Amino acid sequence: MPAVLPIKLNPSQMRPVAYRIFSKKHGLNLKSTGLETLTEIIGKNYGTEWRGAEAAKMMEEICRLWKEQEMGVFVEGKPLQELFDEITASKKAKEKARVQVVSKSVGLTGVEEIEDREGEPQVNVIREAAPSVDVVWKEFFKVISAFDQPLFHYNARQQRFEKRKTKPTLFANAQSASNMFLTRYHLVYNRLLRNDDTTDLKITSIRSLIGRQGEFSIFGMLSKNPEQKICLQDDTGRILLILAAGCKPDPGVYYPEGSFVICNGRYMKSGDAEVFVVITMGPPVAEKRQETITAYGNMDYLGLHGNPHGSVVRRIERQVEASMLAEEKRLVDQKVIVFGGDMYLDNPLTLKALQKVFSTIELEFQDSGTKKPLAMVFSGDFTSQYQPPHLYKKGFDKLEELFKEFSSIITGVKIIFVPGQRDPWTNTFPTQNAVVPLQPLPTTMINRVARLCGEDVSMSSNPCRMAYLTQDMVFYRDGLSERLRKCNLQLDSAKDDSDDSDDDIEIDNDEVMINDVVVNEPESSFDFGEGLSNLTRPVDISTPMASQVGPTNTLSAKEVESRKIVRTICDQGHLSPFNRHDRPVAWDYDETLWLSPLPTILFMVDTHAPKFSLRYEECMVVNPGPFLNRKIASWVEYDPSKKTVKERQLHI
């Protein structure tokens, strides 16, 4: 293609051509900044042929993508430039695309010699295969901190994501707090409407209940009123909840304040009190990852396919996604090593255990010729007690010496540190209520490790994500099990509430019977000595308990507890389904805690929960437990090509 000599155009020259294509044909309105940017693009890339067919074709492509990505009616300069850069990058990728045609004829590729039946001369028939894009997996392998993750605004009315117009901050205003819970509500509500199993379910808003009779289904967030009575709250109002006789909320999940539930029952009014008598209650069902991605137009949630902080919502091309999936299956020797939590570097036994673990991995690497792992994930707390900075730093200095000793398996491997509650500077919150997401470890604390590993070390936030081709891996270090048990609401009847209050609620027992219903808490301590019996083959819990094969009462307390945790987190679509008092969240960064879409795998490192590996709605959730317990070091290895997890243990 001959080189193009750029020219300088004036917006007044470009306006008639742009109006004909953008406004008259596609109904778009070019703002002054958009016209200036378009003039510069066309003049620079098409020169004297700015009125030609190629320039018009480019403008048509811009209009098509602008409307396809639902970027609005008004075309402004910055998003227009980003969209043009995206088109240019896509064209370059397609030019590099390899066309592979394999013929059944021996020695022929893409060409078959065919002889006519009537003896006519042979002809060459060229069969073109669909091009596949060359994918270099390292370009789609990235560790994403919560504070670097692209953030979006959810437009509930149009049910689509848009780029945020304001920069997030840790010191957000009160409007961000209200928007945080409203966005959670709309995301789960729209997911509920998409579910095929709930297509016949008609959700009534709380405001619409007033003055109506009969049974209704309402959806909202569990909360408490000033009298500390349990209520349900949606975007229209709040109503007091009372459980009717025979009502047994789904026992397979927790019900913390701040979680979302569906209630079926009757609206009643006695004096000034308005109540909703609940007949059935349960959580919204989780949605498979691919279904969520398809519902929102194959969005690039993690910013792998362009500028993650640009003003354009990028979509992943199906052709690129298919090539990434093929590359993912081809790379069979890749693995991610995730160590258990509470890696106390101030404990000599921990360093001894790490030395033995590294020695085992190095021996396997040298003897069997296996590849180095993609990444090693170390989860806090990295100290057993609160320590001053200079003592805390000593632990990482000793870790750096270990890395030097085993440089053959450390060099070129992504090293990820996920902070815990006692790590700086989170340890300024001794009440176990630090604001999430937790910020990364200070660079000054691990400067020797950073110098040794260079760009391969990642001081990540908690939680953080790892993107690997089509997969999304989430790493979260928290005591979720303890917090869920502590914050689980006791769903008592109106009779118990009225004992402590003077304003009794009168209910006709002939119409609705009331009794005590309490969600019992499971045991709070577990023995980790037995290890994970089901880690290599994760148990699929997508099927409800009642329909699973075999008696459900044969499940151990550990299995019941682990299933409740997984279902609660996945059904809520959030890593912290609590109110702002039980678990404070940085309001502008709440999106980094979403599990919508569900990740490919969630490493939920909880040292107070039983070890488990469960699969729920095609999302694998793994808890490796503590790193060191009873002189046994534990870690897990994840194979992305097979999507399997293998438990490893080593006696110290």
Curated annotation (Swiss-Prot):
Give an example GO molecular function.
Answer: double-stranded DNA binding
**What Pfam families is this protein classified in?**
DNA_pol_E_B (PF04042)
Its keywords, alphabetically, are: DNA replication, DNA-binding, Nucleus
* Record's keyword annotation contains Cell membrane: no
Pull one GO CC term from this UniProt entry: cytoplasm
Highest taxon above the source species? Eukaryota
Report the function annotation for this chain: As accessory component of the DNA polymerase epsilon (DNA polymerase II) participates in chromosomal DNA replication.
How does this protein assemble?
Heterotetramer. Consists of four subunits: POL2, DPB2, DPB3 and DPB4.
Q: Which family does it belong to?
A: Belongs to the DNA polymerase epsilon subunit B family.
Extra remark: In eukaryotes there are five DNA polymerases: alpha, beta, gamma, delta, and epsilon which are responsible for different reactions of DNA synthesis.
Protein name as it appears in the record: DNA polymerase epsilon subunit B
Origin species, per record, is: Yarrowia lipolytica (strain CLIB 122 / E 150) (Yeast)
**What taxonomic ancestry is recorded?**
Eukaryota, Fungi, Dikarya, Ascomycota, Saccharomycotina
